[in-house]
Amino acid sequence: MAYRDQPLGELALSIPRASALFRQYDMDYCCGGKQTLARAAARHDVDIDIIEAQLAQLAEQPIEKDWRAVPLADIIDHIVVRYHDRHREQLPELILQATKVERVHADKPNVPRGLTKYLTALHEELSSHMMKEEQILFPMIKQGMGRQATGPISVMESEHDEAGELVDVIKHVTQNVTPPPEACTTWKAMYNGINEMIDDLMEHISLENNVLFPRALAGE
């Protein structure tokens, strides 16, 4: 099957660094992972032949880890340590930086107004979300009760969509997380941190939406 006919989520899992390429083109491979490459390329006005050629080059590299073959309990442990714990570190620091930038540069036309508010909303949303996963959903899956977790998984997927919407707002108020020429060191560091957080969050959501949840629902 041609790459253009495959879902973004599958491509992100099967081709090394495909997720970074999709981020470069602002394609949503986590919450929007079911859309085909052709559909995503059309929505973002990307030449399908060019991105297919780029994916073909990436596909020649060995894949680091195929999460589709990893036991669910190991995936869950990885998600908690690699993503949940990291988000809990990232967001409070980004909120502090945003508060400072909005205060010190309030008179600048390019200041990301409202960024502190949106980062705080994302922090609150994810804190509640991750706690529910760790206390309710993940134990169910580890106990082999994935088939009975349809309701909790549906709620988690909906909350992933809500987090994705907040990320879109954050990208909007930060000019796609691009610092203006007058940005100070803190401003630039904050935008680097936001980009890292978005990368982590998209990988996190993709691993749950496209691997963990479908396999759990299938009764693994």
UniProtKB/Swiss-Prot annotation:
Q: Which GO terms describe its biological process?
A: protein repair; response to nitrosative stress; response to oxidative stress
Cellular component, GO, one term: cytoplasm
* First and last residue of the signal peptide: none
Detail the disulphide connectivity of this chain as listed in its UniProt entry. Answer: none
Extract the InterPro entries matched here: FeS-repair_YftE (IPR023742), Hemerythrin-like (IPR012312), RIC_family (IPR019903)
State the UniProt keywords alphabetically. Answer: Cytoplasm, Iron, Metal-binding, Stress response
Q: Which GO terms describe its molecular function?
A: metal ion binding
- Known function: Di-iron-containing protein involved in the repair of iron-sulfur clusters damaged by oxidative and nitrosative stress conditions.
Q: Can you tell me which family this protein belongs to?
A: Belongs to the RIC family. YtfE subfamily.
Protein name, UniProt field: Iron-sulfur cluster repair protein YtfE
Q: Which organism is it from?
A: Salmonella paratyphi B (strain ATCC BAA-1250 / SPB7)
